[in-house]
């Protein structure tokens, strides 16, 4: 302690303050026991003063030196307020730069789907969290593009930090993660929410959900499984969703519930538009041949499903016009072209003989529907 205060000698001796010099002399030459009060609490000092009332004068002198010592020590402390201001300015600048980096990194315009496909799993995971932190994770498509990316594999991390997302986002994430991992616990925890929130899910996610609900279900039981979930959905179910199921499970169309299975719902009936009936009939006929030439037949199915999605066939209703007549006509013309192409291919292959016959009947239905739609088109468009 004496050595510590002696180091201040040069500074103090240059001072004209005689009191400081006196204090330094008191510390360097006085008995060690006199230093004790410097490290005692005020309570201890008060107790000492009570026990040594006879030494009041000496204690006053000692306290005077203590005040001088404290003044010396405090004079060597940094200027806290000015330092705090400098640190605050530093962090303001730092976070301003960070905000700029994050904004640029999460800008939807600068991050196309192709760029996401080239990102690593770690980059995709970081992007998902960044979007959420800055409040830019605003739609299902953003989550879907990341979690369904072929390179993404941070499934456990996302599930571990699911509390960072709101309730609806967690439902979306649970569907996507179950689709990728088939984690039984995820389905056990969230299947009730999948059904209760079904009507709030966008169509692409509903299609994915039906793949989840029918995963690990044998072909013999898939029809009954779907009917079971239709009943569980209750008021959330719409008959048009059966078209969506066909779009989702197109490879198994021939074993899915037929359109007439919905006649139990008297309020909604089981009526479908002619385009919807054609779509289901085509998918059921073609899907029977998947095992014959899987690659070719799957391509046919995918092309037809894509066409039906682009034309929004699911939204058509026999009760009221829900799709512009021109869109319906475009679909039937495109469908005619696709089916004729498939029909020509079947002519050269014996294994597709039955399919060729079925598609021949379908082409007749397509022609009839095309003529019917033409009667509703403006003359200048015919």
Curated annotation (Swiss-Prot):
Keywords: Mitochondrion, Transit peptide. The keyword Nucleus does not apply. Residues 1-12 form a transit peptide. Its main location: mitochondrion. It comes from the Eukaryota. Component of MIOREX complexes, large expressome-like assemblies of ribosomes with factors involved in all the steps of post-transcriptional gene expression. Associates with the mitochondrial ribosome. Present with 981 molecules/cell in log phase SD medium. This is MIOREX complex component 5.
């Amino acid at each position: 302690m004496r050595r510590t205060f002696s180091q201040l000698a040069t500074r103090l001796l240059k001072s004209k303050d005689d009191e400081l010099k006196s204090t330094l002399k008191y510390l360097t030459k006085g008995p060690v026991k006199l230093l004790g009060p410097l490290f005692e609490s005020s309570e201890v000092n008060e107790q000492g003063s009570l026990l040594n009332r006879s030494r009041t004068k000496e204690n006053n002198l000692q306290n005077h030196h203590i005040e001088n010592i404290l003044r010396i020590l405090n004079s060597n402390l940094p200027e806290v307020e000015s330092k705090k201001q400098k640190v605050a300015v530093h962090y303001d600048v730092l976070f301003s730069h960070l905000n700029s980096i994050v904004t640029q990194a999460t800008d939807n315009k600068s991050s196309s789907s192709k760029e996401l496909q080239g990102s690593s799993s770690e980059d995709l995971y970081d992007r998902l969290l960044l979007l959420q932190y800055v409040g830019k994770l605003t739609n299902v498509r953003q989550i879907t593009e990341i979690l369904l990316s072929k390179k993404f594999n941070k499934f456990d991390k996302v599930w571990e930090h699911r509390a960072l997302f709101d309730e609806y986002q967690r439902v979306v994430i649970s569907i996507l993660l179950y689709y990728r991992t088939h984690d039984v616990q995820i389905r056990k925890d969230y299947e009730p929410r999948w059904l209760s929130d079904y009507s709030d899910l966008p169509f692409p996610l509903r299609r994915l959900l039906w793949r989840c609900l029918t995963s690990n279900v044998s072909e013999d039981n898939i029809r009954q499984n779907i009917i079971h979930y239709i009943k569980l959905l209750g008021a959330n179910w719409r008959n048009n969703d059966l078209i969506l199921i066909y779009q989702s499970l197109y490879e198994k169309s021939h074993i899915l519930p037929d359109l007439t299975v919905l006649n139990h719902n008297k309020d909604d009936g089981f009526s479908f538009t002619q385009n919807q009936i054609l779509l289901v009939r085509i998918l059921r006929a073609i899907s029977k041949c998947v095992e014959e030439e899987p690659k070719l037949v799957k391509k046919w199915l995918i092309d037809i499903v894509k066409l039906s999605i682009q034309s929004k066939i699911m939204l058509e209703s026999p009760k009221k016009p829900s799709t512009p007549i021109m869109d319906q006509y475009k679909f039937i013309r495109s469908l005619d072209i696709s089916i004729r192409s498939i029909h020509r291919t079947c002519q050269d292959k014996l294994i597709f003989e039955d399919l060729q016959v079925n598609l021949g009947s379908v082409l007749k239905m397509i022609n009839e529907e095309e003529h019917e739609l033409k009667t509703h088109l403006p003359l200048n468009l015919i």
